[in-house]
Amino acid sequence: MKLLFVCTGNTCRSAMAQALAEKMIKDNGLDFEVDSAGLFADGHSPASENAKRAVEKYGATLDAHISTPLTLKAVSEADKIYAMTADHLKLLVLSLPELSEKAE
């Protein structure tokens, strides 16, 4: 199963969700792939310092994270898409109505 977390710039919320999910998956020996992207990500920004500090409290890291723009390929490959806010979800489903079944 492949999970995709989506927010605005992929430097905070979705990046943190990815890092924490990857840690939980590894710690529990689960078989999931995890990715994150931003609706308006520029593709070259690091995670915010606050996001880095927040995930470090839980033993995860964002030191190597670089923002990733959302692509149709990422959307089509994901089994489940988690939008970080109701507005992100609304924009996703309005733009790609076929996502309504796998996005929340």
Residue ranges and their predicted role:
Residues M1-E77:
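Conserved active-site segments centered on acidic
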Residues C7, Y82-A83:
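Hydrophobic structural packing positions in well-ordered secondary structure
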Residues R13, A83-M84:
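Small/polar loops that bind or transfer phosphate-bearing groups
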Residues K80, A86, K90-E104:
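Phosphate-binding/catalytic loops
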